[in-house]
């Protein structure tokens, strides 16, 4: 009576091993799901960044306002009749 119970227990353990620890087991599925979620978050951040860059490129191609704004803020350029006043920010 004891041998069939032991054989049955061993059989259950042998059948459960691939389910939990095998190549397509639950632990592997959980790990891949976690990696997939992290990749989706990265993709979302990059899509937002790309949209911002695309808008900036479109703005630079379409008119002179964006070019003028960049020249003013990044290079400190002014028009001939303007006076440039710089107010430093407190750290």
UniProtKB/Swiss-Prot annotation:
GO biological process: FtsZ-dependent cytokinesis
Cytoplasmic side: 1-3
Keyword entries, A-Z: Cell cycle, Cell division, Cell inner membrane, Cell membrane, Coiled coil, Membrane, Transmembrane, Transmembrane helix
Subcellular location: Cell inner membrane
InterPro entries attached to this UniProt entry: Cell_div_FtsB, FtsL/DivIC
Membrane-spanning ranges: 4-21
Function statement: Essential cell division protein. May link together the upstream cell division proteins, which are predominantly cytoplasmic, with the downstream cell division proteins, which are predominantly periplasmic.
Cellular component terms per the entry's GO annotation: cell division site; cell septum; plasma membrane
Coiled coil feature spans: 28-74
One Pfam family recorded for the sequence: DivIC
Topology of this chain in the membrane: Single-pass type II membrane protein
Organism of origin: Aromatoleum aromaticum (strain DSM 19018 / LMG 30748 / EbN1)
Disulfide bonding pattern of the chain: none
Protein name (record): Cell division protein FtsB
Protein family according to the UniProt entry: Belongs to the FtsB family.
Highest taxon listed in the record's lineage: Bacteria
């Amino acid at each position: 009576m004891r041998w069939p119970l032991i054989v049955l227990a061993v059989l259950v353990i042998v059948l459960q091993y691939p389910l939990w620890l095998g190549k397509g087991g639950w632990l592997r599925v959980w790990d891949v799901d976690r990696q997939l979620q992290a990749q989706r978050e990265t993709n979302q951040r990059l899509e937002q960044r790309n949209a911002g860059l695309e808008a900036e490129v479109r703005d630079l191609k379409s008119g002179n306002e964006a070019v003028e704004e960049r020249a003013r803020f990044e290079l400190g350029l002014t028009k001939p009749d303007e006076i440039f006043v710089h107010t430093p920010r407190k750290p």
